[in-house]
């Protein structure tokens, strides 16, 4: 049974949970190559910069964490299942109630258009998932996350496993040893996400 204590301990040691939609179990992942975002070199795309400049979306933090994780837990287009199991949702809702899990949301005309969620520990933020209901909303939410992390002087933005979308946003892969070095340094910091 997944619980908050085990999840936090896992993050501190470079692991993260992932549900298997085939068997319903939650497994601990610790990939040899880790996707991270270098915060000091991040640059939003022109489209995202324009959307932010024009205030197309109302950006909020932790306004509706429950809705964000519920949207993230839905299967993606062209997929019938998701790695975000009910067990994972329950633990992250508890982490949010403890002030450790956070969401960044984009609203358009009062409706949730996109967002993301993750966990903040020390100077590390572990991005878990993102979704969009309107084009580019998750990218704008991600840009807002990066700006918040820079403002609070975070060192590490962990994206876990590389995929084309993360690479488009600017993620790079580092080996496990480098990841653990960066994680240890980030965890030494006493930083609040907000």
Swiss-Prot record:
Catalytic activity, EC: 2.3.2.6
GO terms under cellular component: cytoplasm
Subcellular location: Cytoplasm
PANTHER family (alphabetical): LEUCYL/PHENYLALANYL-TRNA--PROTEIN TRANSFERASE, LEUCYL_PHENYLALANYL-TRNA--PROTEIN TRANSFERASE
The keyword Cell cycle belongs to this UniProt entry's keyword annotation: no
Superkingdom assignment: Bacteria
Family, as annotated: Belongs to the L/F-transferase family.
Originating organism: Prosthecochloris aestuarii (strain DSM 271 / SK 413)
Function, as annotated: Functions in the N-end rule pathway of protein degradation where it conjugates Leu, Phe and, less efficiently, Met from aminoacyl-tRNAs to the N-termini of proteins containing an N-terminal arginine or lysine.
GO biological process: protein catabolic process
This protein's UniProt keywords: Acyltransferase, Cytoplasm, Transferase
Catalytic activities: N-terminal L-lysyl-[protein] + L-leucyl-tRNA(Leu) = N-terminal L-leucyl-L-lysyl-[protein] + tRNA(Leu) + H(+); N-terminal L-arginyl-[protein] + L-leucyl-tRNA(Leu) = N-terminal L-leucyl-L-arginyl-[protein] + tRNA(Leu) + H(+); L-phenylalanyl-tRNA(Phe) + an N-terminal L-alpha-aminoacyl-[protein] = an N-terminal L-phenylalanyl-L-alpha-aminoacyl-[protein] + tRNA(Phe)
Gene: aat
Name of the featured protein: Leucyl/phenylalanyl-tRNA--protein transferase
């Amino acid at each position: 049974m997944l619980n908050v204590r085990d999840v936090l301990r896992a993050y501190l040691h470079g692991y993260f949970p992932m549900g298997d939609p085939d068997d319903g179990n939650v497994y601990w992942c610790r990939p040899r190559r880790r996707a991270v975002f270098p915060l000091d070199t991040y640059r939003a795309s022109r489209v995202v910069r324009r959307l932010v400049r024009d205030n197309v979306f109302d950006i909020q933090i932790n306004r509706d964490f429950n809705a964000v994780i519920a949207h993230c837990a839905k299967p993606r287009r062209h997929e019938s299942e998701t790695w975000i199991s009910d067990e994972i949702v329950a633990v992250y809702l508890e982490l949010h109630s403890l002030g450790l899990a956070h969401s960044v949301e984009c609203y358009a005309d009062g409706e949730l258009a996109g967002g993301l969620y993750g966990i903040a520990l020390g100077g590390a933020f572990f991005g878990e998932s993102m979704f969009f209901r309107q084009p580019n909303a998750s990218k704008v939410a991600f840009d807002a996350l990066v700006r918040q992390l820079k403002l609070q002087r975070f060192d590490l933005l962990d994206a876990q496993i590389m995929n084309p979308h993360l690479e488009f946003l600017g993620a790079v892969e580092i080996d496990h040893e480098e990841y653990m070095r960066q994680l240890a340094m980030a965890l030494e910091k006493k930083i609040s996400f907000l």
